[in-house]
Amino acid sequence: MNFTSTIGLEVHFELKTKSKIFSPSPVTYGAKPNTETNVIDWGYPGTLPMVNKEVYRLGLMVALATHSHVNPVTHFDRKNYFYPDNPKAYQITQFFKPLAENGYVEVEVHGKKKKIHIHEMHIEEDAGKNTHGTNGFSYVDYNRQGVPLLEVVSEPEMTDPDEAVAYLEKLREIVQFTGASDVKMEEGSMRIDTNISIRPAGQKELGTKVEMKNLNSFEHVRMSLAYEQKRQQEILLSGGRVRLSTRRFDTNTGKTVLERVKEGDADYRYFPEPDLPPYHIKQEWVDEIAANLPKTADERRKIYVDEYGLKPYDANVLLQNKESSDFFDATVAAGADPQQAANWMNTQVNGYLNEKHAELKDIALTPENLAAMIKLISDGTISSKIAKKVFAETVANGTDPKKYVEENGMAQLSDESVLAPMVKEVVDANPQSVEDYKNGKDRAIGFLVGQIMKQTRGKANPKVINKLLLADLASR
């Protein structure tokens, strides 16, 4: 018997604001527990929330980038539930009138393009974080309480794990390149909930839905959905029934584990947030945001390949994150050859970042200095070998490449009037090499080049030496 899978995804993005959604508390990842929170986050009596306008601006950028319809009037609602990491016993979210609806993301899977539609996206506040100690105690950190989130809810249109992952990869790329979120899954800036049901092929009625919460990698999404497909098929083939439930993915076994069985959808008793008025979004503001949207990854990819002549692979490496792409763009804008800039970014720069477990913003290298160093190579001032020494200094200390080369006498000797007598002297002193060259032994050239490099302590420009050598040998 054949089965059809129906998959839906809910993705939470932590929006990149300096302060929280309803309070002035700062947002800093990794801060000491309970140092970035206040009475508004806790919902103390007499406190009132105030909406951070930047949250709406970032949310609108994502809405526009995903072709979503922006609702001109939105409002917040209370989602009522009790849990230790939720000190107010309710969450402020958007249930009845979300930020935007009816968008889509276009993906390509197995060589076929498909539009996966977005049901809606809404703004809400995050909860705190529970940590369960080995001493029998549980601890709550409220630093995350009130951090702004954008939840993007897909239509249940995906039919296999590959489609789900393709959608997530594309959505992550879109959100990252708007600048709305840093989408760092390891820091909780992007969190994924999935739901999947299966039914016999041809049956219109959907099967019973199983949810999986807080999956923290695309590979875990793929593995958990594939496992659920198989598990649910085996249940139906054996005459059983799939139960409405929430499960978690066990990374050690590669299986999903039951967390709780549900008798129906939870009743959170939503009602309009009484402390916040409706939020009106003016079309002029939407138009202004649309006009200033950053280039998407697809737009940048087209420029890199079609205009700069980069190979698609090199372009995709640069586009793995917005920070890298922005740095590359700035390097080219500073005058660097695009291909050389891509080569250095994808090899030496990325190698240094991996070695130091750092990001571009953490190191001393600037696009201007990288461009200056590339120009020193292009104009023959330094060799590729010397460039690596210059790069090591520049990336570590932010030293100006040109100044460093001048102060340390690292410039190549390219003056033909200076090198020509040296070439003649070396050729005159090595008649056997001349004879070998004339007899077709090209390795003789390498020996002669080596002798000249020895005389100049490695500073002679190899291209100029080769040119002069060939001219001298041809005249004999």
Swiss-Prot record:
The keyword Zinc-finger does not apply. GO terms for molecular function: asparaginyl-tRNA synthase (glutamine-hydrolyzing) activity; ATP binding; glutaminyl-tRNA synthase (glutamine-hydrolyzing) activity. SUPFAM superfamilies: GatB/YqeY motif, Glutamine synthetase/guanido kinase. Its EC number is 6.3.5.-. It comes from the Bacteria. PROSITE patterns: GATB. GO terms for biological process: glutaminyl-tRNAGln biosynthesis via transamidation; translation. Keywords: ATP-binding, Ligase, Nucleotide-binding, Protein biosynthesis. InterPro entries: Asn/Gln-tRNA_amidoTrfase_suB/E, Asn/Gln-tRNA_Trfase_suB/E_cat, Asn/Gln_amidotransferase, Asn/Gln_tRNA_amidoTrase-B-like, GatB, GatB_C_1, GatB_Yqey_C_2, Gln-tRNA_amidoTrfase_suB_CS. It catalyses: L-glutamyl-tRNA(Gln) + L-glutamine + ATP + H2O = L-glutaminyl-tRNA(Gln) + L-glutamate + ADP + phosphate + H(+); L-aspartyl-tRNA(Asn) + L-glutamine + ATP + H2O = L-asparaginyl-tRNA(Asn) + L-glutamate + ADP + phosphate + 2 H(+). Heterotrimer of A, B and C subunits. Allows the formation of correctly charged Asn-tRNA(Asn) or Gln-tRNA(Gln) through the transamidation of misacylated Asp-tRNA(Asn) or Glu-tRNA(Gln) in organisms which lack either or both of asparaginyl-tRNA or glutaminyl-tRNA synthetases. The reaction takes place in the presence of glutamine and ATP through an activated phospho-Asp-tRNA(Asn) or phospho-Glu-tRNA(Gln). Belongs to the GatB/GatE family. GatB subfamily. This is Aspartyl/glutamyl-tRNA(Asn/Gln) amidotransferase subunit B. The lineage of its organism: Bacteria, Bacillati, Bacillota, Bacilli, Lactobacillales. The gene is gatB.
